[in-house]
């Protein structure tokens, strides 16, 4: 069965122009589903609909068998849908723990007043950091980390929401080779726990290595879904661009053109 289904999804940029044109995506539990397409194909737009950042003009989202209206990112997180964006939005002057639970701080009663339960927040943050193999102090300022380390904290934030769906938008763009391997370990563990993972990337080696299924989009439209093991790099590129690679890179002709020049020399000048 599918865990999350988006169907006939349309967003109009302007009258007559659709950023999404009857796009669709079906996610199964415990799978890594690659979403591919050229820049501007609509991949991130589709995912931002699933995460409640954008609202559709047409279409529907079915989650756990029920049609839902995702009102915004916090609503998505509360439902168990998490997204790690390509463009990070960290709060560097706040602690790692605060960044993980921003907008979802645990609370406690202090007399008649409800306050943030900092002890529980840092205790829970330490657990989730350990769960994703990050040896960071949750009390440390986020700004002390590198950009790639901040990206891994974003993944910890998604895991902290006990997500059933995790959307990763170009997750390795700023990671080192060692950090990519660490990310893949996390992805494998989440898949084994039944999490549905959307993986957006232009890196073919990553897609073919980690994905179970691949959906390809072009010009805001759904092109098709295939099992990753059925695909090669050339097949993916052909489906992304809509024509054979041989048409993209036709063989060069060595036949001389109508005009050719040989043995040209330039006149010399001498100083007087």
Regions found by a protein language model. Give the residues of each.
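Hydrophobic alpha-helical bundles that form the membrane domains of multi-pass transporters
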Residues: 7, 12-249
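Conserved structural motif at the start of ABC-family nucleotide-binding domains
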Residues: 20, 258-261
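Electropositive, surface-exposed helix/loop patches at the edges of structured domains
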Residues: 127-128, 256-258
């Amino acid at each position: 069965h599918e865990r999350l289904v988006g169907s006939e999804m349309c967003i109009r940029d302007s009258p007559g122009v659709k950023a999404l044109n009857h796009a669709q995506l079906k996610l199964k539990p415990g799978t890594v589903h690659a979403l591919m397409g050229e820049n501007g194909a609509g991949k991130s737009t589709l995912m931002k609909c699933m995460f409640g950042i954008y609202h559709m003009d047409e279409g529907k989202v079915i989650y756990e068998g029920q049609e839902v209206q995702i009102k915004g990112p916090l609503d998505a997180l509360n439902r168990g849908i998490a997204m790690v964006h390509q463009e990070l939005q960290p709060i560097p002057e706040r602690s790692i723990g605060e960044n993980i639970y921003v907008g979802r701080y645990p609370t406690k009663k202090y007399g008649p007043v409800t306050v943030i339960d900092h002890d529980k927040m840092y205790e829970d943050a330490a657990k989730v950091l350990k769960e994703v193999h990050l040896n960071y102090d949750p009390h440390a300022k986020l700004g002390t980390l590198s950009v790639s380390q901040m990206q891994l904290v974003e993944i910890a934030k998604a895991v902290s929401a006990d997500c059933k769906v995790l959307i990763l938008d170009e997750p390795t763009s700023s990671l080192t080779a060692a950090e990519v391997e660490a990310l893949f370990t996390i992805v494998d563990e989440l898949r084994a726990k039944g999490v549905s993972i959307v993986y957006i990337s232009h890196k073919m080696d990553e897609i073919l290595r980690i994905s179970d299924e691949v959906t390809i989009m072009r010009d805001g439209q759904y092109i098709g879904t295939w099992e990753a093991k059925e695909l090669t790099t050339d097949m993916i590129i052909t489906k992304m661009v809509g024509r054979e690679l041989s048409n993209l890179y036709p063989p060069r002709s060595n036949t001389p053109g109508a005009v050719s020049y040989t043995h040209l020399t330039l006149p010399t000048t001498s100083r007087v």
